[in-house]
Amino acid sequence: MADHSALRATLKKTATDFIDCCNKYTVDAVLSLRTDTCKHTHLPSSLGIPTYSKTEYGAFYGQYVGLMSDCSCRIVDEKEMVVDVESRKVVMYTKAKANTPLGEYENEYMWILTMTGDGKMIEDIVEFCDSAKAVELVKKQQAQMNA
């Protein structure tokens, strides 16, 4: 049972480290805990964002690094974090906030992270956001570009 408890603690630490990396708001930091074969899926699928490889996600994420400042992401309640040792998955609910030239941006996310066997790296990411907030930001960006 000690191995089970240790792996659970490692999975939880990797998940919280992932959020810490998001708060550094650099491409290198956001990619640092991903395996080379890590896939990143955005949901809902109605957003039309494809599943990205690690390299593709770095390019996608890099588009937003200069757009936002004072970014912060936080786990809403660590007690509500779901850690499944057998499947090496962690599910967590987060809230994010950032400043943009178009005003403040806030959103909510559910993350499903699948880790490596030792729990120290991320093999797969499913990110589910409040799509209305994401679409609102994109519409503001497009309006500014067309103005």
Predicted segment positions?
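A solvent-exposed, acidic/Ser-Thr-rich amphipathic alpha-helical stretch
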Residues: 31, 35-88
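Charged/polar, solvent-exposed surface patches and flexible loops
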Residues: 13, 17, 32, 59-66, ...
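Short, well-ordered alpha-helical segments
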Residues: 12, 55-58, 107
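A beta-strand edge to alpha-helix "cap/lid" segment located at domain peripheries
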Residues: 3-5, 65-147
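Short, low-complexity N-terminal intrinsically disordered segments enriched in polar/charged residues
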Residues: 1-32, 36, 143-147
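Short, mixed-charge, low-aromatic patches
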Residues: 12-22, 48-52, 65-70, 93
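Hydrophobic pocket/interface hotspot
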Residues: 18, 29-31, 38, 57, ...
